[in-house]
């Protein structure tokens, strides 16, 4: 990620306020390849995936990973989704926080844990940059920056798509003669 830079030096002293769009653009620039949409495009969609319908609210909802007697559940708002394991719940939780409707899930379950780590790191990196770049600013500005970053990321993920509903298996089988 490199050094975290303040954008205050880039603007003349006469500038009274930094706009939310400027902070959003700077956060997206500093995140670069470590942003959620970049990880999704380069590391998830590049492999065999299947579609998963989260049916999130389209807005930021409260998301929790719950350990119940029935197993691991992902709670999005008032809905609960049963997940096969903790890694899948963590993976889905990042996209639920963004408010995504349909996403791609890697078919290879051994990849999900690593990707969940990267996605969660990208999520927390984004939150840290919001706090850092909006230091000494109003809570309202921080909220506007947060919501715009979520909507930008959601729009990019929707544009990238969720892949096919069922993964393609392009394997040749032996044919008897």
Where are each of the predicted segments found?
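Long, low-complexity, intrinsically disordered segments
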Residues: 167-177
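Intrinsic-disorder-driven secretion/translocation and chaperone-binding regions of pathogen effectors
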Residues: 8-24, 131-136, 142, 148-149, ...
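Negatively charged, low-complexity tracts enriched in Asp/Glu with abundant Ser/Thr
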Residues: 3-56, 154
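Short, mixed-charge low-complexity intrinsically disordered segments
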Residues: 2, 101-155
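Extended coiled-coil/helical scaffolds and adjacent low-complexity linkers that mediate multimerization
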Residues: 145, 155-160, 164-167
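A short, charged, amphipathic alpha-helix used as a generic interaction element across diverse proteins
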Residues: 77, 83-103
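Short aromatic-glycine-(Arg/Gly/Cys) micro-motifs in beta-strand/loop hairpins
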Residues: 50-78
């Amino acid at each position: 990620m490199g050094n975290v830079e303040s954008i205050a030096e880039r603007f003349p002293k006469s500038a009274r306020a930094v706009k939310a769009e400027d902070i959003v653009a700077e956060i997206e620039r500093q995140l670069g390849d470590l942003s959620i949409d970049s990880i999704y495009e380069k590391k998830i969609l590049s492999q065999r995936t299947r579609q998963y319908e989260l049916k999130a609210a389209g807005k930021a909802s409260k998301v929790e990973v719950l350990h119940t007697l029935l197993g691991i559940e992902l709670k999005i708002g008032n809905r609960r989704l049963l997940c096969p394991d903790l890694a899948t719940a963590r993976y889905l939780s990042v996209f639920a926080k963004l408010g995504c409707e349909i996403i791609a899930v890697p078919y290879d379950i051994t990849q999900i844990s690593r990707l969940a780590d990267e996605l969660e790191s990208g999520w927390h990196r984004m939150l840290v940059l919001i706090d850092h770049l909006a230091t000494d600013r109003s809570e309202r500005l921080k909220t506007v920056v947060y919501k715009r970053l979520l909507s930008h990321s959601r729009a990019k993920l929707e544009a990238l798509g969720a892949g096919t509903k069922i993964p393609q298996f392009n394997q040749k089988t032996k044919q008897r003669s």
